[in-house]
Regions:
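Structural alpha/beta core scaffold segments of enzyme domains
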Residues: 1-273
Length: 273
């Protein structure tokens, strides 16, 4: 067998939703009303009630349409800020809107992460896949903010997309290591662990296909057929849609697949000179 190793790193990323964070709050003798495009109405109500010193039954949250959330609007800070400003102007509706700079600077970021991969190929196929990823824990930080504590035990979010891909590799292992507090606030970012683990996993599958001297799509298809037929059909579909392996002169193509939240997704990317 031929052994391959690789290391990958990804940075912290802001959500950068199209609509910067904003909320409107109105405090009267009857209580608090807040208009907020949020992803956690019950937690928003509780946090705003605490900020205003009111019982929850005197707080009404109007969950509006939002110009992108991606996990960022699951946080409570922007709704609480509007509440606190409204407390200084009772009887007057107050709207707070963050600048783009404030929105980027005060995010709860997608974690930075590092992955170290080891694999082996033999007779044109993969026979070993060993992966380790390290980075801050999104789930632990977010749950501590929302509920005041994080349940003990392994963090499945940290390794999703790394251990559960539909490839039949006979010797496979995935490990997650939660980094100590890096003093950078992290939070849920669309697709969560899959956003970096999918990249790590598929980048390394390409390395294994190259080491095996195999076509990268056919290499994946052979592994998927023995693991889960629906995933294999997805690869067959993108093969047909893209006309793989035929391509115009002066172009390059890549393929990737990721099983995320119950669905296998594959894509073919074409780059031209």
């Amino acid at each position: 067998a031929t052994e391959i190793t690789a290391e990958y790193r990804v940075p912290f990323l802001a959500h950068a939703t199209m609509e910067p964070l904003n909320a409107t709050a109105h405090i009267t003798a009857g209580g608090l009303e807040i208009w907020s495009g949020n992803q956690l109405p019950s937690f928003t109500r509780r946090a705003c009630a605490d900020a205003a010193g009111l019982p929850e039954n005197r707080v009404t949250v109007h969950t509006t349409l939002m110009g992108g959330g991606f996990g960022r609007r699951g946080e409570l800070d922007f709704s609480v800020l509007a509440t606190r400003v409204a407390m200084a102007r009772p009887g007057t509706p107050v709207m707070t809107t963050w600048s783009r700079e404030e929105d980027m600077r005060r995010d709860f970021y997608r974690p930075a992460a590092i992955a170290r991969m080891r694999g082996a190929v033999k007779d044109g196929g993969a026979v070993l896949f060993d992966a380790a990823v390290a980075g801050p824990s999104t789930a632990r930080q977010a749950l501590e903010r929302w509920m005041g504590f994080a349940p003990p035990g392994p963090d499945k979010v940290h390794v999703e997309g790394l251990w559960n891909q539909p490839y039949a590799i006979p010797n496979a292992r995935a490990r997650g290591h939660v980094a100590p507090d890096l003093k950078v606030p992290v939070g849920f970012w669309r697709s969560v662990g899959n956003s970096y683990n999918g990249f790590f996993h598929e980048s390394f599958v390409d390395e294994m296909a190259h080491a095996a001297g195999a076509d990268p799509l056919q290499f994946r298809l052979a592994l998927a057929q023995d693991a889960w037929r629906p995933a294999a059909r997805v690869l067959e579909a993108v093969r047909e849609m893209s006309g793989w392996p035929d391509k115009p002169e002066g172009t390059g193509r890549g393929v990737a697949m990721c099983f995320s939240f119950g669905t296998p997704v594959a894509c073919v990317l074409e780059v031209a000179e």
